[in-house]
Curated annotation (Swiss-Prot):
GO terms for cellular component: eukaryotic 43S preinitiation complex; eukaryotic 48S preinitiation complex; eukaryotic translation initiation factor 3 complex. Coiled coil: none annotated. Component of the eukaryotic translation initiation factor 3 (eIF-3) complex, which is involved in protein synthesis of a specialized repertoire of mRNAs and, together with other initiation factors, stimulates binding of mRNA and methionyl-tRNAi to the 40S ribosome. The eIF-3 complex specifically targets and initiates translation of a subset of mRNAs involved in cell proliferation. This is Eukaryotic translation initiation factor 3 subunit H. Pfam families: eIF3h_C, JAB. GO terms for molecular function: metallopeptidase activity; translation initiation factor activity. Keywords: Cytoplasm, Initiation factor, Protein biosynthesis. It is found in: Cytoplasm. Component of the eukaryotic translation initiation factor 3 (eIF-3) complex. The eIF-3 complex interacts with pix. Interacts with mxt. CDD domains: MPN_eIF3h. Residues 21-153 form the MPN domain. GO terms for biological process: formation of cytoplasmic translation initiation complex; positive regulation of Notch signaling pathway. The keyword Transmembrane helix does not apply.
Amino acid sequence: MANRGGRHARNEDSENTINYVQCDGLAVMKMIKHCHEESSNMDLAQGALLGLVVDKCLEITNCFPFPKSGDETMDEEMYQLTVMRRLRRVNVDHLHVGWYQSSDVGNSLSLALLESQYHYQTSIEESVVVVYDTQKSSRGFLCLKAYRLTPQAIQMYKDGDFTPEAFRTLKVGYESLFAEIPIVIKNSPLTNIMMSELNELLPEDKGHNFLDLGTASVLENHMRSLIERVDELYQEAVRYNKYQQVVFKQDTEKHRALAKLAAENAVRTSKGEPTVPEEEVIKQFRPMPVPARLTATITSGQINTHAQHIAQFCSQSLAKLFITESLQNAKETKEIK
C-alpha cells in the first residue's frame, strides 16, 4: 500500500481546506460489498477512491478495489491506471482522492495505515482514508469514518525521528496522529424515491432484532483484542525500561571514569606532565540508540479504541436490558388483566 499514492503530485505544504467528505451512495455500497466479501475470507479489503474537490468538500463519486496482494503476476500500478483510464472514457470521475480499507473489531489504527496515508497525503494533498468496520456494521450500526494525518504526524514522518524527544517536541500522541473528517452520504433524488417505495414494501419490524441480548461474542472479541494490545504495550514498556537502565549504567560509568581522569590530571599537573583530554574517555562510551516509540504509541491508540468500543457496547446492552425488562413487565401486566 505504501507506494499506491505516488501520482498526481501536489504541494505538500498547502493548507488543508477539506471540511467534510461527501460520499455518493453507489460508492458506499461498492465499498460495503467489497469489505464484506473479503471479511468472509479474513482478508483486509482495500481500494481506491475517485472523485473531486469542490470548495471545501471532498466528493467521493466512485471507487474500485485493489487486486489481492497474493497475485504476484498483477502489476498494481498498471491495474489502477487502466481502471482510471477506462472510467475517463465513459465520462466518470477518475481523479484519485484517497483509498479505503476494511476494519475488524474497531481496530483500524496500525503502522501500515499510517505509512500508506503518509505516502498518499504527501503526493495527493486532499487524500483521505475511509475505514469501514465490517463487524460493527453487521450489527446494524453503519460505521464509516474518514481520516487524515495531522500536520504534526506528517512532520514526524518527514523527519523520520520517532524518539520520545521528537514526540514531546511535536506534541504527538495516539490521539493526534489522525484527524477525523466528517463524512456524509448523498443520494440522488431518484434513489431517495426508490428507497421510500422499497421501505413501504418491507414488512413492519417488530424490533426483536434490536433487543437481542445474545451478543456476548462481540464483547469477548473486544476483550481478547484488548488483552493482546495491553500485553504488547507491556513488552514495549519492558524494552524501554531496559534501555533506560543501560543508559543510566553507562552514564554512571562515564562519570566515574571522568572523575578518575580528573584526579589523574591533577597529579600530572602537579608533576608538570601534559594532561589527558576528556574526549579520550568520552569517545569510549558510545551513545545508545534510542528505541522508537511509534509502535508503543499506536498500541496505546488501539487500547483506547477498544476501551471506547467496550464502554459503548456495554451502555447499549444495559439500555437493551432495561427496555426488554419494561416490555416484559408490560406484557405480563396485560396478560393478568
